[in-house]
Structure formats: C-alpha cells, structure tokens
Curated annotation (Swiss-Prot):
EC number(s) stated in the UniProt entry for this protein: 3.6.1.7
Catalytic activity: an acyl phosphate + H2O = a carboxylate + phosphate + H(+)
Name listed for the protein in its UniProt record: Acylphosphatase
Active site: 38
PROSITE patterns in alphabetical order: ACYLPHOSPHATASE_2, ACYLPHOSPHATASE_3
C-alpha cells in the first residue's frame, strides 16, 4: 500500500505533559515515521507518514492522547508532504 503523510494539530492541555514523547512512541509502535513538536501557541503539531490505516489509528489515538493530557481538538490537515523521515522524532 502506498505511503501517505498527514499533519495533525492537537489542542488542549498538551504541552508539559509528555504528549510529544508519547506520540513518538505511538507512531513507532504503529510503524509510522514523522515528528511531533510543540508550537508557540500551546498546540502540538504532528506530521506522520505511513499507510492510510495506520494514520487513521494514530488520528484516533491523538484524540485521547496519554493519560497526562487533556485533548480538546485534533485537526487533521490534508498533506502533500513528501519527506522521507527516519523514525519518529521529537522536535
């Protein structure tokens, strides 16, 4: 199956609670590549690449996040990103 990339913007109480770390771990567990990073406005940006099914699994996970977080909203942006990420980084 063809690899796709998606960008997600996660809002809520998602910084300072290990959200990027847990997202990286979940991404690797799902066989995805990409990154998670904190944004200046308090949101977290996640870019992930993999099969559509695995991206959907990550999207569903992001809506809950780790127990330490309180996710208010996850926006999924269509992405034409074509980057060959190695692993799942925290930026």
């Amino acid at each position: 199956m063809e690899k796709q990339c998606s960008k997600f913007i996660v809002s809520g109480h998602v910084q300072g609670v290990g959200f990027c770390y847990h997202t990286s771990h979940q991404g690797l567990k799902l066989g995805l590549t990409g990154y998670a990073k904190n944004l200046n406005n308090g949101d977290v940006e996640v870019v992930a690449c993999g099969t559509p099914e695995r991206l959907e699994e990550l999207y569903l996970w992001l809506q809950e996040g780790p127990k330490t977080a309180s996710v208010r909203q996850v926006r999924r942006l269509s992405s034409e990103l074509e980057h060959d990420y190695q692993g799942f980084e925290i930026l």
